[in-house]
Amino acid sequence: MIPLRLLFSTSYNPWFNLSLEEYIFKNMDQNQTILFLWRNQNTIVIGRSQNAWKECNTRRMNRDGVKLARRHSGGGAVFHDLGNTCFTFMSTQKNYNKNVSFKIILDGLNSLNISAKISGRNDLIINTNQGDRKISGSAYRQVSDRQLHHGTLLLNVDINKLSYYLNPDSKKLKSKGITSVNSRIINLNTLHANITHDLVCNQLKTAFFNYYQTTVESEIISIKNFNHIKDFSKQFNKQRSWQWNFGNTPSFSHYLDNRFNWGSVELHFDISHGMINRSHIFTDSLNPEPLEELSKKLIGISYNAVTIQHCCQEWTKNWPQFQELQEVTHWLITNVT
């Protein structure tokens, strides 16, 4: 048994990287510590108990091909691109805690003349002329005899995309999930113009080896290393599923209203586990029957654009004489997801 492992992922797929993290965490040897370094391309990663619709602009994400990935730890929503270095420390050693991994990260940054410090429970900050700025957020998880500490380092993240996709629509959502805390952030390339993912990984590797006073061969991991492993495939299929990423959302309500030329419509949704379990429509239309039927048809379907659009298409077939129903369909699809 090797007491240390150092892993690098060649994949930018968040579902693969989070599946790999979870698979290794569950199957690692006793008295072992692992550092896993990875990146995701254009992804929003949300905490285990967060509401995807509340945290993210899901319509923009769907249109632009930005992935949603729900992790197994708690905490808030984060935007990932290739300007982000992701780290995961996993250990089954009895004396391990996240202060160990924080020290390794801080030592690695210090070797680049970047002086950072811990803020609160899970953040790293640096002091600037504008005050303290966040460069890293992380989450900690402990299960039985093993611990996991993972997070991000902001090297050269596209700040515009971060605010574009993490800024939720002005939907009237009431959620029981955890809401992300907006923090003032800064990219490390403002302090170190030549900083790169490879450079940071190399410094973290050195700090990792120095802390444990030993070295090991790095392991370069790609999807092809794991696609034949049944347990991993099961984890990967779960990680990328709609049910895990959206269906695990805590219960919430959604209210919509609009004024059409022919009347006003108010729509109230209750959503649980990603499914619409209550729907009620109020209208002053002179022909309320079609809308009343739609309200009933929406109950029991999943809360996503494809199923809602299909439901509306079937609904309008029953009322071909009412052209205004096409307006309702377009409004609903545009505003719900």
Curated annotation (Swiss-Prot):
Q: Could you confirm whether the keyword Acyltransferase appears in this record?
A: no
What is the scientific name of the source organism?
Blochmanniella floridana
Instruction: Give a yes or no for keyword Nucleotide-binding in this entry.
Output: yes
This protein's pathway:
Protein modification; protein lipoylation via exogenous pathway; protein N(6)-(lipoyl)lysine from lipoate: step 1/2; Protein modification; protein lipoylation via exogenous pathway; protein N(6)-(lipoyl)lysine from lipoate: step 2/2
Q: Where does (R)-lipoate bind?
A: 134
What else is on record for this protein? In the transfer reaction, the free carboxyl group of lipoic acid is attached via an amide linkage to the epsilon-amino group of a specific lysine residue of lipoyl domains of lipoate-dependent enzymes.
Q: Which Pfam families match?
A: Lip_prot_lig_C (PF10437), LplA-B_cat (PF21948)
Xref: InterPro entries: aa-tRNA-synth_II/BPL/LPL, BPL_LPL_catalytic, Lipoate_ligase_A, Lipoate_protein_ligase_C, LipoylTrfase_LipoateP_Ligase
Give the protein's biological function. Answer: Catalyzes both the ATP-dependent activation of exogenously supplied lipoate to lipoyl-AMP and the transfer of the activated lipoyl onto the lipoyl domains of lipoate-dependent enzymes.
Q: Which residues form a coiled coil?
A: none
Report one GO cellular component.
cytosol
One biological process term in Gene Ontology:
protein modification process
Top-level taxon of the source organism: Bacteria
Q: Which UniProt keywords apply?
A: ATP-binding, Cytoplasm, Ligase, Nucleotide-binding
Protein name (database record): Lipoate-protein ligase A
Q: Which gene encodes it?
A: lplA
Q: Where in the cell is it found?
A: Cytoplasm
- The EC number on file is 6.3.1.20
Could you say which protein family the record assigns here? Belongs to the LplA family.
